[in-house]
Amino acid sequence: MEKLLHYVWKHRILPLGDLSTTDGRRVEVIDPGTHNSDRGPDFFNAKVLIDGMLWAGNVEIHLRSSDWYRHGHDSDAAYDGVVLHVTQDADCEVTTSQQRSIPQVCLQVPAALAADYQTLLHTDEFPRCHHILASMSPLRVHGWMDRLLAERMQQRAGQVMARVDAFGGDWERACFVTLCRNFGFGLNGDVFERWAKCISLQAAGKHRDHLFQVEALFLGMAGLIGHAFAPEESDLAMRTQQEFDFLANKFSLTPTLQYADWKYLRTRPQNFPHVRIRQIARLYHSGQAQMDALLNVHSVQELHERLGAAGLSASATRLILINTVAPLLYAYGSSRGEEKWTDRATDMLEELPAENNRILRVWKECGLRVTSAADSQALIQLKKMYCDRLDCLRCQFGYAYLRSSAARGDRQGGTTESTDTTDPLG
């Protein structure tokens, strides 16, 4: 409930009558301040008038005043700049580490708002705010989708950069591992990443021109040679094993994975790990899995053709473009401060058609436009980072839902008015 009190303060859903401190001084909120999600006071740089005197500083919010002491703020100098303490229950006075008494305001969450917030949290429906979506302005919806897409790209680029850092700035290796992980298409993603990290690109590079040797190396390191061939291909399986044994001895390689590590159940034949590893081998052999090759492509169609040549279906190719190529380009551009790469990544998503899955079909049924991969990636981000975490208070859709509650409470003769028109993350 404290999060909801933050929401009420941030968006100035304040009493219709005069707001006053616990000792009777009139309070007027000029600026609620900037919400702080890190350590320290909840709102920075707020401005309030207390009995006509302007106070500029920080605001701290608790359900009870005694929480101030329970959290140790009375002995923490980081809270000495607090000029107003907002609480639902003023059960004691509060002071700073310098023994300065802090004015307090009792602020209640409007009943209609609290009820609708509880409905959002406890409904089994998805999305919880579905009935408000059709009435939202296209401008607000599109603005929120743009921010969600940027958030998702930054998050996925961060995952790429973590690999780059882990590999000592080696973009080529980070590219290979990122690509291989996404060839797991979810179910085998973690295992593919483990496998890719075991591959010696130095060893593979010495035999890149020979596809048979690359396949033998890749399948052998995956522990899958004995499961990658049909019974009538026993001779080929034996030669592949012999080739891998030769390469493993030459480069002192030891397989760390075995068949049991891979998931075959509930996997379609085209997604069997050994099938995907052969496709990766063909990409590596042709040079299309290299970072330079991805950076120097000129169109989505060209990328489609390059990846398709490795035996990927059109839908699998699109997923690799969305989940591998776009994040790599975005990460590369962000790390170098070059927008041409980040723009190319987002342009690629806007050009590619949206994925087709259950989550996106539900959003479509709610009236949202889902035509490109940019749209679908934004809505996947919304589902994973907001809906699944019940983080409705930071969501534009949740904001619109709860704002209607505040307005309804006012119309019904309630005690609140919402004067704020900013978005929940601003």
Residue ranges and their predicted role:
Residues 86-204:
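Internal, well-ordered alpha/beta segment that forms a basic, Gly-enriched binding/recognition surface
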Residues 32-37, 45-50, 67-75, 90-96, ...:
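Catalytic micro-motifs at enzyme active sites that drive phosphoryl/nucleotidyl and oxygen chemistry
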Residues 416-426:
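Short, low-complexity, charge-dense intrinsically disordered segments
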Residues 7-66, 79:
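N-terminal ordered "arm"
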Residues 365-408:
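Acidic, carboxylate-rich catalytic segments that either coordinate divalent cations
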Residues 77-88:
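Elongated alpha-helical scaffolds
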Residues 148-378, 391:
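Hydrophobic, aromatic-lined core segments that form the binding pocket/scaffold
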